Amino acid sequence: MAPARTMARARLAPAGIPAVALWLLCTLGLQGTQAGPPPAPPGLPAGADCLNSFTAGVPGFVLDTNASVSNGATFLESPTVRRGWDCVRACCTTQNCNLALVELQPDRGEDAIAACFLINCLYEQNFVCKFAPREGFINYLTREVYRSYRQLRTQGFGGSGIPKAWAGIDLKVQPQEPLVLKDVENTDWRLLRGDTDVRVERKDPNQVELWGLKEGTYLFQLTVTSSDHPEDTANVTVTVLSTKQTEDYCLASNKVGRCRGSFPRWYYDPTEQICKSFVYGGCLGNKNNYLREEECILACRGVQGGPLRGSSGAQATFPQGPSMERRHPVCSGTCQPTQFRCSNGCCIDSFLECDDTPNCPDASDEAACEKYTSGFDELQRIHFPSDKGHCVDLPDTGLCKESIPRWYYNPFSEHCARFTYGGCYGNKNNFEEEQQCLESCRGISKKDVFGLRREIPIPSTGSVEMAVAVFLVICIVVVVAILGYCFFKNQRKDFHGHHHHPPPTPASSTVSTTEDTEHLVYNHTTRPL
């Protein structure tokens, strides 16, 4: 019996070598597909759920960085990744990220990328990113944000009856009684979410008063009462700031940030109790950072670095700037999405990162600040083949209330049309004369509008795992086929050997040897590899 086992092992040895080699190849290939960004922090989607929350990818456009940041978009970071879907996964693990912009390597296909940029395209719930045509880039947006953008483009150049100042805005306010909101003519306000004790009163056709607001968030739906726009609605969020939130939005020192852009902004000075202008660099700012002075005043009216009298007459004491308690690291082991994780696992508020003052025990919050600067600089250096990006902007009446006749360009009809300009803010798709409008935007059509062309599929985690499973099954089938071939070949040799040279063993011994050999082959081909 022992010699038979030895012979069986000897016969199987040649088959074992290619089997092991193939198994190692399959295993290494499988391991290579598992690399990727770290798992998402608490509250953020990961894996297949993450990838499924993004669009397939809009090709042929690049972010107009200066215009987007000027509108309120936020550059988050530029991680080093190898593939497009890794960039999307990095967006999933980054708080407030809703755009993953991928720069492709020339002539290397869709999965070889040169750079990855993560952006927050929302400001006050509005989509504020702007794009310009440029080959070699793919944009992945969260489906929710992309859907809002497409709805905006679908409404397109017909306009909306919702006053511009209130379309999708997110108000930050101090506790006050009542909150008076002006320029709301022809709108009905209905509470969708929040404390139901709040009352909406209209004592003037042009303004509403909100009574009973407490700390927390309220969602109102505005509906146009004008017959010209019977179905127009918009949501407005009102957040009554708590003491802790007021520290962030009103008492934090103005923070230029590490990036070297130049964007005019407003911040609140609690010492003088006024809003002041400053120049924002483009990244790593804090919440005391407003696009318009009106927002700043509404959020921080009456806040000072000492006693503050609330609507109920109680005294609320605010420190000069964020409390020292919030500057101390918390080493509980779990960081919130709004916190920065130090290298030693401790947590600090995210606005303390790269503020030129080490707040982590190991100073890791000041160790990698150049990555933001280099990523933002690279994004700003991208050139556009055309300077006609304003020609695809929707006509913007602005925030003022004048009635100035102007012309705007419609890329779908490739003609210019009239609209009424309010006199301030707005955009550059705004011309005094029709001929000036046509000459400025000649050649621009719907193909230049972001998001209305074909999309490129993005591999999901599920599809990658399926590909890995198929690859593994193929490897196993090949191994089994090789082993089977070698086994039957050796069996055939045994048959011819027995026919010409009968072995000097009893028949029972021959049967036992054959069963033993089959037993060994079965174990070798079916045991876990």
UniProtKB/Swiss-Prot annotation:
Residue ranges occupied by any MANSC domain in the UniProt entry: 57-140
Subunit structure: Interacts with HGFAC. Interacts with TMPRSS13; the interaction promotes the phosphorylation and cell membrane localization of TMPRSS13.
Organism the protein comes from: Homo sapiens (Human)
Name the record gives this protein: Kunitz-type protease inhibitor 1
Positions annotated with a glycan in the UniProt record: 66, 235, 523
Signal peptide region: 1-35
One GO CC term, this protein: extracellular space
Domain notes per entry: This inhibitor contains two inhibitory domains.
Taxonomic lineage: Eukaryota, Metazoa, Chordata, Craniata, Vertebrata
Annotated keywords: Cell membrane, Cytoplasm, Disulfide bond, Glycoprotein, Membrane, Protease inhibitor, Repeat, Secreted, Serine protease inhibitor, Signal
Domain BPTI/Kunitz inhibitor residue range list: 250-300, 391-441
Function: Inhibitor of HGFAC. Inhibits serine protease activity of ST14/matriptase in vitro. Inhibits serine protease activity of TMPRSS13, via the BPTI/Kunitz inhibitor 1 domain.
Compartments where found: Secreted; Cytoplasm; Cell membrane
GO molecular function terms attached to this record: serine-type endopeptidase inhibitor activity
SS bonds (residue pairs): 250-300, 259-283, 275-296, 335-347, 342-360, 354-369, 391-441, 400-424, 416-437
GO annotation terms (biological process): branching involved in labyrinthine layer morphogenesis; cellular response to BMP stimulus; epidermis development; epithelium development; extracellular matrix organization; negative regulation of neural precursor cell proliferation; neural tube closure; placenta blood vessel development
Pfam family, one: MANEC
Sites annotated Reactive bond: 260-261, 401-402
Domain LDL-receptor class A stretches: 334-370
